[in-house]
């Protein structure tokens, strides 16, 4: 009798995605981040659900409801900090996952890559709205500053901002709708993950060598299930170390002050995982220009496949491109640092240089490096 997992309509889907899936035999730990992201998403939905049971999305009670969760709800503090730091782990895994795609040329799987970009935007929107919910100073002013960017849209900008606010400033209506969106978007993301995997399984995974692995496949289970479980355990270990020993390490102390529209914090800044984009936004002295640069800093990923000039897929055997890739990583770390600094000399100049370098590497230097490497190999 044929195994039920290969026959049952539902079990068959799971079987073909997680058990009998033919996987390349040489994929490294950089291929672990996909499953780690799934773990992060599941953790965030679970902890978020329990937080939503005790949270109230009203300007008068939001801040105290979060305090109530931490003080009075059984294990409320651990749920709250797992959710807050879980977001940080989520973004670490996201950036590693995208970095892997850039390094090994996974962006040649166009549909998977583009769905991934949409997913990235969805999760960034979710995280931004989640940061507003505790209704601390940084929540309120972060929401005010970021939503205000839409006023740079010609002609309809002001109307657009007021429509999103549900009034003439960030207030009760804004908080309520942000909570609604923050609750629903992770489920939208889950659906997109399914589509992401659907497209990935049409072509099969890429591998470090960049060469087709059709002739050398191994079953996903047990080889990669055990590897993914190890990765997940390490992820949870790091998350719990963060939660137990320094839960506020990555947060902003200003968010422990209740939101006050009459007092602006000295430095308004988003969570650390948005600082690189925030630095690019601030480095352009024009409002509309800054907003466009902010959008392009992520949207540039969509044109990466069109800029691929090398005749090799990944960067494994391309030292010039490798150098540029790690220069890009260093540049992004520099931008992250600058985003958290006040707007004054020399940070402004460093931010502008780092922003120019970011776009130059991706749009100009990497395609040129590909051509040079082809030439060196006489291809």
From Swiss-Prot:
The cytochrome bc1 complex contains 11 subunits: 3 respiratory subunits (MT-CYB, CYC1 and UQCRFS1), 2 core proteins (UQCRC1 and UQCRC2) and 6 low-molecular weight proteins (UQCRH/QCR6, UQCRB/QCR7, UQCRQ/QCR8, UQCR10/QCR9, UQCR11/QCR10 and a cleavage product of UQCRFS1). This cytochrome bc1 complex then forms a dimer. Belongs to the cytochrome b family. The lineage of its organism: Eukaryota, Metazoa, Chordata, Craniata, Vertebrata. Signal peptide: none annotated. It comes from Arctocephalus australis (South American fur seal). It comes from the Eukaryota. InterPro entries: Cyt_b/b6_C, Cyt_b/b6_C_sf, Cyt_b/b6_N, Cytb/b6-like_sf, Cytochrome_b, Cytochrome_b_C_euk/bac, Cytochrome_b_N_euk/bac, Di-haem_cyt_TM. One of its GO terms (cellular component) is mitochondrial inner membrane. It is found in: Mitochondrion inner membrane. This is Cytochrome b. Binds 2 heme b groups non-covalently.
